[in-house]
Amino acid sequence: MLAPLLVTALAVAACSTTTPGAATTATTSASSTSTPAAASASAPSTLTAPHLPPSKGNDGTSFDPCVAYTAEEIRSWGVDPARVVDNGNDGLRTRGCTWSADGWSIAQSIINNPVSDYLNTPVYPGSRAEKIGGLDGVVYQSPATGDSMCTAALPSQQATVHVVVGIYNEKTGRKAVPDLCARAVEVATFVATKLPK
């Protein structure tokens, strides 16, 4: 069960680069007109490399999880704001960032599809609708990762924001986060306060 998560973590790590200097963000017309995104852009980024702008498969919301939070907010989730990877590599349908701690991580990703795509589907058996931060969200686990990963998905404009809590070291990660879905919902409840509707 751990192998798919480890492969994913290694693939993400292999695609990341660290570039010295200040992080930059692209400005789009959608983010410059939306109050929540404008407020998000003012938070100091914990990224260490230039940040890619949204692409066709993930531009349905002006929200950018990679620059939406302060280091203190990220730290309050239990992960290290300095251990961040930008998952928005060229060619991927999703964009977002992953923050890590010893044995586990929190990723946030965006894709242009409705939250309802994650309900009543054989791909995510056992998915459930749940009110999260006042929004109609979905909580699900993938059979491919079993109980080593849990996702809380929230609607934002014409996209879905996924908050994924995953274990990459069973011994240390499971001790730190015994209930992945509870942590995913807890973080997603905070994320909901930042999302443009």
Task: Put a short name on every predicted segment.
Residues 1-13:
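Sec-dependent bacterial lipoprotein signal peptides
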Residues 126-197:
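A short, solvent-exposed beta-edge/loop patch
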Residues 16, 65-67, 96-98, 149-151, ...:
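Sequence contexts marking disulfide-bonded cysteines in secreted/extracellular proteins
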Residues 33-65:
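N-terminal low-complexity, Pro/Thr/Ser-rich intrinsically disordered segments
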Residues 76, 80-138:
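Short, solvent-exposed recognition patches
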Residues 64-82:
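Amphipathic alpha-helical segments
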Residues 11-42:
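Bacterial lipoprotein signal-peptidase II cleavage site
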